[in-house]
Amino acid sequence: MFRSLIKSLQTGARTSGIRKMTSYGDYVKFMELVGNVKQLKRTGWVLRSVNDPETVASHMYRMAMLSFLIPEASSLDGIKCMKMALIHDLAEAIVGDITPYCGIDRAEKQRREHKAIHEISSLVPTMAGDEILKLFDEYEGQTTDEALWVKDCDRYDMIQQAFEYEKRDEVPMKHQEFFESTRGKFVNPFFLHMVEELNKQREEYHENFTARLEKTNHSSSS
């Protein structure tokens, strides 16, 4: 499937007998827009003054890597999940990372992102562009097993990232709100187990951190 995508980028594609001509200039522009998400900091972390927060691209990358962990017995299309993860926030290359705190309602957010993803997909040949649009709309619709998996990836990456910031900055339980926001929302059993393990490690870190702090304070007061 990756070969067919690369081939379409190189030679163009046909849909309903219509050939869309694209140029290497379009490809450079496409890659420039993709590059925007490599620099775009995720709004949720910025608003909470997290030092050196992750970018949108790094978030999507780890979501895509989760596709390698799809259980072997699963009927999920792993390549499709990986592609969907890599494009689900691609519209943010143009509109930015819009969150509920930005003062923009959901309908307007969807309108802006829909316009942006069409602009981005127009820079690649028809077959590739159609696939980008289809995957984007499928994710937004949340009606397929793959879309539900990728949404779970989105939620899971966020809470693992929150825990990693807690450890890096030595602020146990500081980002509890992110865990609360995902509680009861995971669908796939795989992620239920992942969240259980993550919470276990987070509690252990909190307990160990507290014990070390109490020991340090006791030594200082002696």
Protein language model regions, located:
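Alpha-helical, largely C-terminal catalytic domains
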Residues: F2-S222
